[in-house]
Amino acid sequence: MTQHFLLFDIGNTNVKIGIAVETAVLTSYVLPTDPGQTTDSIGLRLLEVLRHAGLGPADVGACVASSVVPGVNPLIRRACERYLYRKLLFAPGDIAIPLDNRYERPAEVGADRLVAAYAARRLYPGPRSLVSVDFGTATTFDCVEGGAYLGGLICPGVLSSAGALSSRTAKLPRISLEVEEDSPVIGRSTTTSLNHGFIFGFAAMTEGVLARLNGVLPGPTEVVATGGFARDIARVSSCFDHVRPDLLLQGLRLLYLERDAR
């Protein structure tokens, strides 16, 4: 019987749940991050996810997570134990991330940033340097040279910026962030002005940051985009070499499979 892995990317806004086998991440689901949930509510949702994928608890061989929300960790850990009969392994913590962490205080780096950087290096071993750009709650630029995690930059996120603008402006409409054009248009409505301003504004920010990073990283350098808005930004910008929305889930899969080889 094929063993499946349940992978958890526990972020500030959402929990992304991936179902994987040894060779690939097969599918993923996104649930809101809610510290107010109970172990049972999370466990029942996990059973729903598995049922939707045509699986049951007996098909799950391992549960692996990275998290930037410590308050949610024990809830999901207990849910995995009670409903799936599996211990939830965290990276880092239970599973080491084999990168030389050059941060001044290594423990300060978010687990998601390290896992994504590791995944980028494992999936794209050729270039001397890599930049992983994650369009999540924040937009992060994480730099890898060889086997070393150098650090990076943290910028505002697309959705969090849109939410902040909407909450502070009484007359502006809610932003959909849906843009069909490949080039910005001069908006003749507030909605068009906002949507194009956000998508092309973040694309320009990304291009500018990457251009400056290229000036300080030893080349050749390749750029991997991930996160919820990776495809949206990639459609209007040519600054990415690879687009992998599932980059972090791929990293968790690889970390689990290679944990005994190190």
UniProtKB/Swiss-Prot annotation:
Substrate binds at Y103, G110, A111, D112, R113, T190. A monovalent cation. Ammonium or potassium. It catalyses: (R)-pantothenate + ATP = (R)-4'-phosphopantothenate + ADP + H(+). InterPro entries: ATPase_NBD, Type_III_PanK. Keywords: ATP-binding, Coenzyme A biosynthesis, Cytoplasm, Kinase, Metal-binding, Nucleotide-binding, Potassium, Transferase. K(+) binds at D134. The keyword Transmembrane does not apply. It is an enzyme of class 2 (transferase). The active site is at D112 (proton acceptor). Its EC number is 2.7.1.33. One of its GO terms (cellular component) is cytoplasm. One of its GO terms (molecular function) is ATP binding. Its main location: cytoplasm. It is found in: Cytoplasm. Catalyzes the phosphorylation of pantothenate (Pan), the first step in CoA biosynthesis. This is Type III pantothenate kinase. It comes from Nitratidesulfovibrio vulgaris (strain DSM 19637 / Miyazaki F). The gene is coaX.
